[in-house]
């Protein structure tokens, strides 16, 4: 798919994690023209302009499921369509596992597609210790893939380096969100003097493929920083899926003036052999506004199977034999009789 690099691009953050990430992205110079935010909790809007928000309200105080959140969001469909507007490309960014992100991400992506936009889901997957959220995350990831032209999967566990013993849970989430922003912003960077941006077409050419696109990050400040960062990114990718199954990739290098052309060439030339996918189609971008610590962000696509298959055991067992796998919509108990069916 070819899209004008100056096409109208929107990003929609959903739920706590999605809103925090999109809010931080909005402060950077990216290939995104406008930003919107959707949540069931008005506390999520504390760092954003309220005119860009859509609040999904529930008249009853009840723990919501993803299906209930979608049911409540039906009344806001027109406002979501307004948020999409005339965008040619819409990035739908949400944390998977909670009711809001899991429920709304596939729904918002389907609305964007209905509006004629290219919907690209960005799914933030839960930490390993958040085992109770895995089922919601797995089901929502699959439905987001069905509702979008492509899905980028961001794994919180992969984003995190070693943390100290006194790290709080809030600090852990904050650090993961900032790491996601750093990686995503390097890939969505606008062209500027002295740097080589990827551009929208190259990004979409990688993401809009069968299966899933996986994000892997690594950094190094050693004398062999390019080789070390590449190795680290491939190792991280291998924790999510079989690297040999990758068909396309974009790699973004963020460093300073010490990053040499031979080092950039080494990463691009060796990525195929490092993943074991010799026919890998590689695009790349370079940003020299970073530090001597090289950050490498890798997007690899074409994965039909990932570690997240185990998050949705029913789909794994039944496969294509699932009889009814459409998105379900529900309402909190007591509201069903208040809502017309037409």
Regions found by a protein language model. Give the residues of each.
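Tubulin/FtsZ superfamily GTPase core signature
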Residues: 1-342
């Amino acid at each position: 798919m070819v899209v004008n690099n100056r096409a109208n691009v929107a990003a929609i953050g959903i739920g706590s994690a999605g809103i925090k990430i999109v809010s931080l992205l909005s402060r950077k110079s990216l290939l995104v023209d406008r930003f919107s935010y959707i949540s069931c909790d008005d506390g999520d809007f504390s760092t954003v302009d309220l005119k860009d928000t859509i609040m999904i309200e529930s008249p009853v105080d009840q723990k919501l499921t993803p299906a209930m959140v979608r049911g409540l969001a039906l009344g806001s469909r027109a406002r979501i369509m307004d948020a999409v507007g005339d965008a040619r490309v819409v990035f739908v960014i949400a944390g998977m596992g909670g009711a809001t992100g899991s429920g709304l991400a596939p729904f918002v992506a389907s609305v964007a597609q209905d509006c004629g936009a290219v919907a690209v889901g960005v799914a933030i997957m839960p930490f390993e210790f958040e085992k109770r959220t895995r089922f919601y995350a797995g089901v929502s990831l699959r439905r987001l893939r069905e509702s979008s032209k492509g899905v980028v999967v961001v794994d919180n566990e992969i984003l995190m380096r070693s943390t100290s013993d006194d790290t709080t849970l809030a600090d852990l989430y904050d650090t993961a969100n900032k790491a996601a922003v750093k990686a995503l912003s390097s890939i969505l960077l606008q062209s500027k003097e002295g740097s080589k941006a990827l551009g929208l077409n190259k990004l979409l050419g990688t993401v809009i493929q069968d299966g899933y696109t996986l994000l892997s990050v690594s950094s190094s400040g050693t004398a062999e920083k390019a080789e070390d960062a590449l190795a680290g990114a491939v190792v991280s990718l291998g924790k999510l899926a079989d690297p040999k199954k990758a068909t396309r990739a974009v790699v973004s290098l963020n460093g300073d003036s010490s990053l040499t052309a031979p080092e950039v060439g080494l990463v691009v030339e060796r990525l195929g052999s490092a993943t074991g996918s010799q026919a890998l189609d590689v695009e790349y971008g370079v940003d020299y506004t970073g530090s001597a610590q090289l950050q490498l962000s890798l997007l690899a696509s074409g994965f039909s199977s990932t570690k997240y298959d185990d998050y949705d055991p029913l789909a794994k067992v039944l496969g294509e034999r699932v009889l009814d796998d459409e998105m379900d919509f529900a309402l909190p108990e007591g509201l069903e009789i208040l809502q017309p069916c037409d």
